[in-house]
Amino acid sequence: MSDNEDNFDGDDFDDVEEDEGLDDLENAEEEGQENVEILPSGERPQANQKRITTPYMTKYERARVLGTRALQIAMCAPVMVELEGETDPLLIAMKELKARKIPIIIRRYLPDGSYEDWGVDELIITD
């Protein structure tokens, strides 16, 4: 039996009830009761002036910074430290992190929608 021989008249789905949840969604849109707040394009979350988060780099931030920087180095970005025969981008990124020369800013988002920007050179790195 091939696809050309099948008869799909659309009558096979007569016994299915319509979903009433869609009607509720349509009614909410008609009444103007949206739960979404739309901000103007110029209005963005503000950076906190006084920092409240810890000055320590987390292991997740460290992994993300090293991975991002290693990818940049692999794609021929300029290296910020003197090379002593290293060719592995990850090892070069680790050397840059130890020398605090990675040109990346970490943005930490807070629950109220604001954020804090920390330079890699400002954070305390534990090994």
Swiss-Prot record:
Biased composition (Acidic residues): 1-34
InterPro entries per the UniProt record, alphabetical: DNA-dir_RNA_polK_14-18kDa_CS, Pol_omega/Rpo6/RPB6, RPB6, RPB6/omega-like_sf, Rpo6/Rpb6
Keywords from the named record: Acetylation, DNA-directed RNA polymerase, Nucleus, Phosphoprotein, Transcription
GO molecular function: DNA binding; DNA-directed RNA polymerase activity
Compartments (UniProt record): Nucleus; Nucleus, Nucleolus
GO biological process: transcription by RNA polymerase I; transcription by RNA polymerase II; tRNA transcription by RNA polymerase III
Pfam families, per database record: RNA_pol_Rpb6 (PF01192)
A single GO cellular-component term on record: nucleus
Region (Disordered): 1-53
Entry-annotated residues carrying N-acetylserine: S2
In-chain residues carrying the UniProt-annotated modification Phosphoserine: S2
UniProt superkingdom: Eukaryota
Subunit structure: Component of the RNA polymerase I (Pol I), RNA polymerase II (Pol II) and RNA polymerase III (Pol III) complexes consisting of at least 13, 12 and 17 subunits, respectively. Pol I complex consists of a ten-subunit catalytic core composed of POLR1A/RPA1, POLR1B/RPA2, POLR1C/RPAC1, POLR1D/RPAC2, POLR1H/RPA12, POLR2E/RPABC1, POLR2F/RPABC2, POLR2H/RPABC3, POLR2K/RPABC4 and POLR2L/RPABC5; a mobile stalk subunit POLR1F/RPA43 protruding from the core and additional subunits homologous to general transcription factors POLR1E/RPA49 and POLR1G/RPA34.
Function text: DNA-dependent RNA polymerase catalyzes the transcription of DNA into RNA using the four ribonucleoside triphosphates as substrates. Common component of RNA polymerases I, II, and III which synthesize ribosomal RNA precursors, mRNA precursors and many functional non-coding RNAs, and small RNAs, such as 5S rRNA and tRNAs, respectively. Pol II is the central component of the basal RNA polymerase II transcription machinery. Pols are composed of mobile elements that move relative to each other.
NCBIfam families according to UniProt: PRK01099.1-3
Annotated family: Belongs to the archaeal Rpo6/eukaryotic RPB6 RNA polymerase subunit family.
Record's protein name: DNA-directed RNA polymerases I, II, and III subunit RPABC2
Organism: Homo sapiens (Human)
